[in-house]
Amino acid sequence: MKYTLLIIPIFSFFCTASMWYDKVEEPIIEDKLIAAIMQVESGGDTLAYNSKEDAVGCLQIRPIMVREVNRLLGKDSFTLYDRWSKAKSIQMFNILRSHLKGASDEQIARTWNGGYNGHNIPQTMQYWLKVKKYTQSNIKNK
C-alpha cells in the first residue's frame, strides 16, 4: 500500500515537470532561403560543428544567436542544445527573420551571417552570392 501511494505522486511529478518546459509552438517553415542557407552553412548536416566559432547544426548557430532569439521572445525558450535540432534551428531562424520586417532575402541572409548590421558589411556579400546560387537551384533537403 505504501508503494502505491508513492507511485502516484511520482507519476504526478513527471506529468507536471513536462509542462514546465516552455515550448515554442511555431510552425516549422522551411523554404528555399532556409534550404540554401543550410547548404552554405553545413551542407544540410545537422551534426555539423565548427569548434572555432562554436557554431552548431544545419544552420551553424552560435551561442550569441540563441541568446538573441531568446531576447526577441522575451523568455528563455531555446537552449544551446537546441542548435542540434533541425526543427528548432529553423524555428530560431524564422523568429529572427520575423523581426526583420520587410527585409529582402539578401538582407536576411547577410544579417544571418554578419549580425544586425550584416547587410552593410562588404564581406557578407560573398556569403549572399553563395546562398543566392542555391536559392536558384533545386536543393534536395536531407
Please report, for each region that a protein language model flagged, where it lies by residue.
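Active-site-proximal loop/helix of nucleotide/amide-processing enzymes and allied scaffolds
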Residues: 125
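Alpha-helical segment that forms one wall of the substrate-binding/catalytic cleft
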Residues: 63-120, 128-137
